[in-house]
């Protein structure tokens, strides 16, 4: 079998794709890089917004045409597969294999049968499963929990991924040991609400540490860098900020979604906190981590959002001064309370507000990134940038960074760089040695001769 996997959505989907891919390899499958090479195509889907659902529909339409011309098995997994909406799509486009987020380990059973296979149960065996580590990568994801116990009115995740189930700490640490042995230097702990780790359906689990203490455990493992996502403000405790401050491996980066700056909108979203409570968390974080890099999620145009509500979101952005933000127009998802009970705003209103928020974000990102010029940053470089004479990666604070290759630093690794230029979306620097001096840059070839039409410029 030649299998090709396509992933839409979040980092948890990326982790799940790796899990299923490793299962396929264990069954003897070859993983190929394109649909044309494959006789089995598996799509890992996202259902949080309408746009990725539309992409899946389009892709399945193309694959159905290919099925009419050659032997091809088509599978769909992930959040959309768990929904009636996704199951209707699967029927329409003649999908052969359908796996929900809780039935990923059924992939072998699905491929053994000669008829259509649907696996949509939430199975306990998934939580103890430890996939083999990715090979040749410095970064890896590590799922510490699945599902969510919150019920935000706009969110389909509790339906698609089920109630929260925390993985046993022994399984987490065993998987971490495998990642370390494979050369991973940065791990991101994943969950819908990592701060609630160890408290499932409101009950503290015996033998499970708090998330703050899990951070301390992971930070003492020998891993070079630790990050985590996503956090819910309702469950963020000051002890998490304290654990970050006292654990050198944990990066000074917090992604804390706010969604709106208006208490009225937050109530309609059922977010369970107020603007004031959220700002108190920000103050706690900065008390322990004065140089913390802060990112957030914001939904624009939630049903009933007035111009006054939106102005409160803009003012919150200024009050916090985020380094980065993931900003989205509200997307009504069938099956959610907001879809059932609230009337949507006109598309043009939502789009105009999003443009104003993006302008605000660019202003703050430019200001924050400019402050990094002249500083020394630890950067994890993944590999070649668009111009192969440069390396790309990110700082401990998740800033995308580009540097020219230098003697002793021409490939992936963690290095130190002096930042010399910044844009709202990128830092540019030069690699330095332990003595603080610039490392000699490697000779550069003519970009045209190398076939590079858009070399990155260091300015």
UniProtKB/Swiss-Prot annotation:
The keyword Transmembrane helix does not apply. Its cofactor is [4Fe-4S] cluster. It catalyses: N(6)-dimethylallyladenosine(37) in tRNA + (sulfur carrier)-SH + AH2 + 2 S-adenosyl-L-methionine = 2-methylsulfanyl-N(6)-dimethylallyladenosine(37) in tRNA + (sulfur carrier)-H + 5'-deoxyadenosine + L-methionine + A + S-adenosyl-L-homocysteine + 2 H(+). Residues 370-433 form the TRAM domain. [4Fe-4S] cluster 1 binds at residues 10, 46, 79. The keyword DNA damage does not apply. Pfam families: Radical_SAM, UPF0004. [4Fe-4S] cluster 2 binds at residues 148, 152, 155. Its EC number is 2.8.4.3. It is found in: Cytoplasm. Binds 2 [4Fe-4S] clusters. One cluster is coordinated with 3 cysteines and an exchangeable S-adenosyl-L-methionine. Keywords: 4Fe-4S, Cytoplasm, Iron, Iron-sulfur, Metal-binding, S-adenosyl-L-methionine, Transferase, tRNA processing. Gene3D superfamilies: Methylthiotransferase, N-terminal domain, tm_1862 like domain. InterPro entries: Elp3/MiaA/NifB-like_rSAM (IPR006638), Methylthiotransferase (IPR005839), Methylthiotransferase_CS (IPR020612), Methylthiotransferase_N (IPR013848), Methylthiotransferase_N_sf (IPR038135), MiaB_methiolase (IPR006463), rSAM (IPR007197), rSAM_horseshoe (IPR023404). Residues 1-116 form the MTTase N-terminal domain. Residues 134-367 form the Radical SAM core domain. Its main location: cytoplasm. GO terms for molecular function: 4 iron, 4 sulfur cluster binding; metal ion binding; N6-isopentenyladenosine methylthiotransferase activity. Catalyzes the methylthiolation of N6-(dimethylallyl)adenosine (i(6)A), leading to the formation of 2-methylthio-N6-(dimethylallyl)adenosine (ms(2)i(6)A) at position 37 in tRNAs that read codons beginning with uridine. Belongs to the methylthiotransferase family. MiaB subfamily. Monomer. This is tRNA-2-methylthio-N(6)-dimethylallyladenosine synthase. It comes from Deinococcus geothermalis (strain DSM 11300 / CIP 105573 / AG-3a).
């Amino acid at each position: 079998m030649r299998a090709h996997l396509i992933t839409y959505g979040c980092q948890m989907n990326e982790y799940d794709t790796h899990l299923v891919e490793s299962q396929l390899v264990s069954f003897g499958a070859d993983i190929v890089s394109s649909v044309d090479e494959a006789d089995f195509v598996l799509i890992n889907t996202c259902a949080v917004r309408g746009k990725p659902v539309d992409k899946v529909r389009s892709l399945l339409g193309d694959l159905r045409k290919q099925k009419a011309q050659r032997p091809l098995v088509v599978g769909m997994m992930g959040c959309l597969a768990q929904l009636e909406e996704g199951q209707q799509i699967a029927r329409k486009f003649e999908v052969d294999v359908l796996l929900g987020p809780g039935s990923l380990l059924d992939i072998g059973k699905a491929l053994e049968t000669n008829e259509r296979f649907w696996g949509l149960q939430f199975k306990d065996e998934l939580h103890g499963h430890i996939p083999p580590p990715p090979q040749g990568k410095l970064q890896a994801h590590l799922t510490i929990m699945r599902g969510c116990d919150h019920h935000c009115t706009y969110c389909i995740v509790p339906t698609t991924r089920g109630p929260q189930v925390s993985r046993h700490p022994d399984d987490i640490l065993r998987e971490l040991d495998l990642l370390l042995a494979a050369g991973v230097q940065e791990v991101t702990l994943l969950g819908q609400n990592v701060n609630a780790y160890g408290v499932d359906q409101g009950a503290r689990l015996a033998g499970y540490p708090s998330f703050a203490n899990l951070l301390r455990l992971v930070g003492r493992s020998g891993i070079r860098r630790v990050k985590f996502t996503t956090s819910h403000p309702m469950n963020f405790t000051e002890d998490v900020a304290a654990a970050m401050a006292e654990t050198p491996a944990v990066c000074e980066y917090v992604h804390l979604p706010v969604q709106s700056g208006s208490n009225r909108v937050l109530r309609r979203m059922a977010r369970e906190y107020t603007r004031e409570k959220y700002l108190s968390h920000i103050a706690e974080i900065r008390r322990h981590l004065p140089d913390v890099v802060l990112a957030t999620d914001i939904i624009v145009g939630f049903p009933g959002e007035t111009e006054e509500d939106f102005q409160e979101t803009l003012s919150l952005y200024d009050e916090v001064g985020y380094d980065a933000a993931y900003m989205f127009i509200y997307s009504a998802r069938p099956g959610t309370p907001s879809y059932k009970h609230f009337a949507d705003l006109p598309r043009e209103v939502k789009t105009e507000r999003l443009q104003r928020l993006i302008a605000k974000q660019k202003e703050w990102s430019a200001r924050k990134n400019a402050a990094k010029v002249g500083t020394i940053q630890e950067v994890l470089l993944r590999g070649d940038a668009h111009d192969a004479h440069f390396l790309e990666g990110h700082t401990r604070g998740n800033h995308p960074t580009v540097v020219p290759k230098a003697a002793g630093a021409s490939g992936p690794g963690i290095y130190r760089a002096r930042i010399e230029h910044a844009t709202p979306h990128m830092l540019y620097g030069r690699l330095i040695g332990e003595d603080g001096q610039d490392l000699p840059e490697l000779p550069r070839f003519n970009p045209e001769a190398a076939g590079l039409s858009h070399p990155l410029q260091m300015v």
